[in-house]
Amino acid sequence: MTKEELCRYCSVSMEDLDNGCAYIDLSNSSVDSLPDNLNVPVLFLRNCTSLERLPENLNAFSLDISGCTSLTSLPASLRVGILTLDETNISEIPEFCMDMCQSISAVDCKNLKRIPKIHKIGRLDLSGSVIEALPETLEVCDYLGLVGCKNLTSLPASLKQVNRLNVSQCENLRSLPEDLFVIEDLHIEHSGIVRLPENLMVGNGFYASHTDLKTIPSQVRIGGLVDLSYCKKLFSLPEGWIVNGYLGLAHSWIHELPEHLTVKGNLDL
């Protein structure tokens, strides 16, 4: 597709396209190529199953290529701020691309086994991917989603603080980084986690149902609700523990509560 054809298809002017002002939405189309050197604020290419490659020197604030099943790689020259590549066959994200990204969503990318070295990113969702390890220097500010990443066995020690963390259904993940502070919600349901960091802090909800947790360290602090239902290896709670919201213990093996336990919400036994 040439620039002229792109302008006609999307009803935008060549001037706007050349000046980087054109909003381009080609989702669900049969487009199989795009012109090189595109500079656009937003480029939607959802479910363009005939598209086999992205143009060279593509510069976009937001790029959505989710469902582009014929795409297997990204150009090294790609410059993008928000990248959505859910349900694609992409196996690797270029390292230079990661330096610019504020947000990456790679949900259900079954060929994505690793991501390159990255220091800090706002949002990273790799749920349903076959990712085996995360960069040792990784820092995520807002959200880290790893739901169902069954090949993941550990999280980097550099992950000290994150707004929201979801590692539910990570069957081979046994522990969390030491001194972890999750500002809002922490989800570990149906994961392989068997122990919590001694100084874990969660600002809001802690969701840990259907795990093999055996103990809750006395220094763990949770700001909101706590769901420990179906934790069949958990026999006790810390003495003097304070739960500021709902406490779910249904179908756990806790038969006796600590004498000085404080629950400020509903208690479900």
Which residues make up each language-model segment?
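Short, surface-exposed loop and linker segments with low hydrophobicity and enrichment for Pro/Ser/Thr
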Residues: 15-19, 97, 179
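Canonical leucine-rich repeat
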Residues: 34, 51-54, 71-74, 93, ...
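Short amphipathic alpha-helical segments
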Residues: 56, 76, 98, 157, ...
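Short alpha-helical interface patches
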Residues: 137, 158, 260-261
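N-terminal capping/linker segments that flank leucine-rich repeat
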Residues: 1-33, 41
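Concave beta-strand-loop units of leucine-rich repeat
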Residues: 22-30, 39-50, 59-70, 79-90, ...
